[in-house]
Design a protein with these regions (language model features):
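Structured lumen-facing ectodomains of secretory-pathway proteins
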Residues: 1-146
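Loop and turn regions of beta-sandwich accessory domains that flank beta-strands and are enriched
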Residues: 1-2, 138-214
């Protein structure tokens, strides 16, 4: 299975090798389970106040610090950004998970990258125009075809993991109708393995069971 698979993919003139595919942590904002469009990336600094730039058709690079994540992301979304990349302001290669109830109401995908990558990306944007980025998740897909046609009440999925950090694991289930259940997501528990679990979802209520589940 891919590990550390959430990436910011950068395209532009002579992109440094260290910026082509930047590892990122997700947030409690919408998760890019499918790749986002490649959008021109704009550095908006700290985003302490409402952003006056028109970010429609663009993505925002935001520096951590002084105000909370949810406010920064709200400003980016209000300016029209398609997604946001928040860069750390300390810690070198350290990354944080942008969690919390307020962040869950952010309408755009948002990820967090480390200070070293973020500073290099900001400098690259300063020196080059037309730089684009997209969010992409490296993932393994298992397919299960159900031939019985039943009306779904709830779904149970048993999964077994061999991974030392449950914090890293994201597990989703997509029905033939296209409804996605998030069964396990990134979290702050970095000290224990996930092992084997039964996951339950009622998001597929009244859907047909027949077809391919992934």
């Amino acid at each position: 299975l891919p590990d550390d698979g959430l990436r910011v993919l950068v395209s532009g003139p002579r992109v440094p090798a260290t910026l082509v595919s930047i590892p990122a942590y997700p947030s409690d904002a919408p998760h890019p389970d499918e790749p986002t469009p490649a959008l021109e990336l704009t550095d908006v600094g700290l985003a302490l106040v409402a952003i006056t730039n028109d970010l429609r058709g663009r993505a925002a690079l935001i520096q951590r610090g002084q105000n909370n994540f949810s406010q920064k992301l709200e400003f980016a979304a209000a300016a029209g950004a398609g997604f946001a990349v928040v860069r750390n302001n300390q810690g070198g290669t350290e990354r944080l998970y942008m969690g919390g109830a307020e962040t869950q109401f952010t309408p755009i995908p948002a990820v967090f990258i480390d200070q070293t990558s973020g500073q290099a990306l900001s400098e690259y944007l300063r020196q080059n125009s037309g730089v684009t980025a997209r969010l992409s998740l490296q993932k393994a897909i298992a397919r299960l075809t159900v031939t019985n046609t039943l009306q779904v009440d709830h779904v149970r999925l048993r999964a077994r993991f061999a991974h030392a950090r449950r914090a890293d694991v994201r597990l989703t289930l997509v029905s033939p109708a296209g409804t996605r259940s998030v069964l396990h997501h990134h979290n702050s528990d970095t000290s224990s393995p996930l092992g084997e679990w039964d996951f339950h979802s009622v998001r597929h209520l009244l859907e047909s069971s027949a077809g391919e589940w992934t």
